[in-house]
Amino acid sequence: SLSAKDKANVKAIWGKILPKSDEIGEQALSRMLVVYPQTKAYFSHWASVAPGSAPVKKHGITIMNQIDDCVGHMDDLFGFLTKLSELHATKLRVDPTNFKILAHNLIVVIAAYFPAEFTPEIHLSVDKFLQQLALALAEKYR
């Protein structure tokens, strides 16, 4: 679980991420689709899954907006993400492993954007937060 320090660390770095969240979301999603090409299967209905394409940009923004909402609900991620978990489990049928893959790609992009601010301590807190988020999204798969 997230300690008070973890929550403070996430909120601190999120304040820096937020102004660039559209770019970060698009780059993290683009990176995931290139490095883990099996994830493209979930987006076959898009006109293009190429990095920088309009659907990738749009979904990157959607993802980051949802994560932004989660930053404000760190004390109840499971409750907060119930409907989104149901959607991914029952309608979209996304393999929950992909939530961790996206989390990894987000960390890579955040580290590239904020090399000085993304200290090992911040990295640990962000990783714990994103893993909790991934776990909450996977809740309805059980």
Swiss-Prot record:
Globin domain residues are 1-142
Q: Name one GO cellular component term.
A: blood microparticle
Instruction: Identify this protein by name.
Output: Hemoglobin subunit alpha-4
**Could you describe the subunit structure of this protein?**
Heterotetramer of two alpha chains and two beta chains.
Q: Which residues carry this modification: N-acetylserine?
A: 1
Xref: InterPro entries: Globin, Globin-like_sf, Globin/Proto, Hemoglobin_a-typ, Hemoglobin_oxygen_transport
Gene name per UniProt? hba4
Q: Which GO terms describe its molecular function?
A: haptoglobin binding; heme binding; metal ion binding; organic acid binding; oxygen binding; oxygen carrier activity; peroxidase activity
Which sites bind O2? 59
Query: Which terms under GO biological process does the entry name?
Result: hydrogen peroxide catabolic process
Organism of origin: Oncorhynchus mykiss (Rainbow trout)
What family does the Swiss-Prot or TrEMBL record give for this protein? Belongs to the globin family.
